[in-house]
Regions:
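Bacterial Sec-dependent N-terminal signal peptides
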Residues: 1-19
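GH16 jelly-roll
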Residues: 18-250
Length: 250
């Protein structure tokens, strides 16, 4: 019986820790409960390299075969197929020019694909179209860890800081959160923090993280990070997203 109570306590603790701080209110969300993607919120990115800059192998489409909504979930599906000169297809969507924000609490419930050459991501780019980037979650290959990374360019020179989780089953649904304030960008999974970047007073020229950013979701195949050895037996494989919610502090 004590183990049941412990499980319930830990489950409740995770729920509480994964929720926004007191005083934060919902300002944007997508629960993915509609029949199709809400294009008032999202834009499809389509095409292949050199558009993406990572030597990825897939062609991003907006076809039902690669992106669809079902059972209250967004499905982004990577496939092995010949299409427009590429041997793989997938999907990538963004809120660019639809929604961007500065500071807040980001909450998303996501199940990630895992496999050799697979590179799913939930991330953000600067709304001013500079290259500054906040990678909320990325996973590569068969690793059962998730990486969170901030990229910026002090004095025009590239730098980054990142953190990673302990080993866990990334293919199951987990709650991924970011608390972004004037002082820090803090990343957590199921309420467990794994990386925090100090941006207080734009220390280390982190001033780019005091501007607006927009959201992106995608599943890449191959590329500079996962490499180019792809297990073709794993396809189709997909990311599933239950919801994304953005809260702001009053």
């Amino acid at each position: 019986m004590k183990y049941i109570f412990l499980f319930l306590f830990l489950s409740l603790y995770t729920i509480i820790k994964s929720k926004p701080p007191e005083g934060y209110n919902l300002v944007w969300s997508d629960e993915f409960d509609d029949a199709s993607l809400d294009t008032s919120k999202w834009v499809y990115n389509t095409g292949a390299e050199p558009n993406w800059g990572n030597n990825e192998l897939q062609y991003y489409t907006k076809r039902q075969e690669n992106i669809y909504l079902a059972s209250g979930l967004l499905h982004i599906r990577a496939r092995h197929e010949s299409y427009e000169g590429s041997e793989y297809t997938s999907a990538r969507i963004t809120t660019r020019k639809k929604f961007d924000f500065k500071y807040g609490f980001i909450e998303a419930k996501i199940a990630l694909p895992r496999g050799k050459g697979i590179w799913p991501a939930f991330w953000m780019l600067a709304a001013n179209d500079k290259a500054d980037e906040i990678d909320i979650i990325e996973a590569v290959n068969t690793e059962n860890v998730v990486y969170s990374t901030c990229h910026w360019y002090p004095n025009g020179e590239y730098t980054h800081e990142s953190g990673q989780t302990d080993t866990f089953d990334i293919t199951q649904f987990h709650i991924y959160t970011v608390l972004w304030t004037e002082e820090m960008i803090q990343f957590a999974i199921d309420g467990n923090e794994h990386f925090t970047l100090n941006i207080k007073n734009s220390v280390r020229q982190t001033n780019s993280f005091h501007g607006n950013f927009y959201l992106l979701l995608n599943v890449a195949v191959g590329g500079n990070w996962p490499g180019f050895e792809i297990d073709d037996n794993q396809f189709p494989t997909e990311m599933q997203v239950d919801y994304i919610r953005i809260y702001k502090n009053n």
